């Protein structure tokens, strides 16, 4: 069985799926370019029940994202990098499981994955790597020409991640500076 590595080419991503990973709630957002505009195609959350077993919860995430890949011709998946704290190693391990099935869904769909640290997403969106969530939500609202600030936070974060993926994949100069 051969291994194929899929990588994104600069300037080649016109439909991007942004993912804010979580075992309980995974936020996702699909954006695409229509002429000079960026358009939000779909956004939402995939929720798993805390009462389900870990494999059942992971399957729920995988099935949900596989459905998104089946509906949209995604060119690139932008995934928030794992953030962990030494006080909560168990949380980091569980998040690693969630990120694993998210990456599996992308690989199964033949979609390349780019990983972005939360501070990088914030810097690309606002110029400040420590920007508060409210500032990120406002930036997303303005850049996608939305009527209101996106809610819940998982969806807003996924939108920001997809926008970051778009800007960095389509502008190599920004990628070098970010």
From Swiss-Prot:
Keyword tags: Cytoplasm, DNA damage, DNA recombination, DNA repair, DNA-binding, Endonuclease, Hydrolase, Magnesium, Metal-binding, Nuclease
Reaction(s) catalysed by this chain's protein: Endonucleolytic cleavage at a junction such as a reciprocal single-stranded crossover between two homologous DNA duplexes (Holliday junction)
Gene3D superfamilies: Ribonuclease H-like superfamily/Ribonuclease H (3.30.420.10)
Pfam families xrefs: RuvC
Co-factor binding comment: Binds 2 Mg(2+) ion per subunit.
Residues at which Mg(2+) 1 binds: 20, 154
MF terms in GO: crossover junction DNA endonuclease activity; DNA binding; magnesium ion binding
Active site: residue positions: 20, 80, 154
Swiss-Prot/TrEMBL GO biological process terms: DNA recombination; DNA repair
Positions that bind Mg(2+) 2: 80
Cofactors (names): Mg(2+)
Keyword DNA-binding: yes
Cystine residue pairs: none
Gene Ontology CC: one annotated term: cytoplasm
Subunit structure: Homodimer which binds Holliday junction (HJ) DNA. The HJ becomes 2-fold symmetrical on binding to RuvC with unstacked arms; it has a different conformation from HJ DNA in complex with RuvA. In the full resolvosome a probable DNA-RuvA(4)-RuvB(12)-RuvC(2) complex forms which resolves the HJ.
NCBIfam families per record: ruvC
Function recorded in the entry: The RuvA-RuvB-RuvC complex processes Holliday junction (HJ) DNA during genetic recombination and DNA repair. Endonuclease that resolves HJ intermediates. Cleaves cruciform DNA by making single-stranded nicks across the HJ at symmetrical positions within the homologous arms, yielding a 5'-phosphate and a 3'-hydroxyl group; requires a central core of homology in the junction. The consensus cleavage sequence is 5'-(A/T)TT(C/G)-3'. Cleavage occurs on the 3'-side of the TT dinucleotide at the point of strand exchange.
Family to which the UniProt record says this protein belongs: Belongs to the RuvC family.
PANTHER family for the chain: CROSSOVER JUNCTION ENDODEOXYRIBONUCLEASE RUVC
Name of protein: Crossover junction endodeoxyribonuclease RuvC
Biological source species: Rhodopirellula baltica (strain DSM 10527 / NCIMB 13988 / SH1)
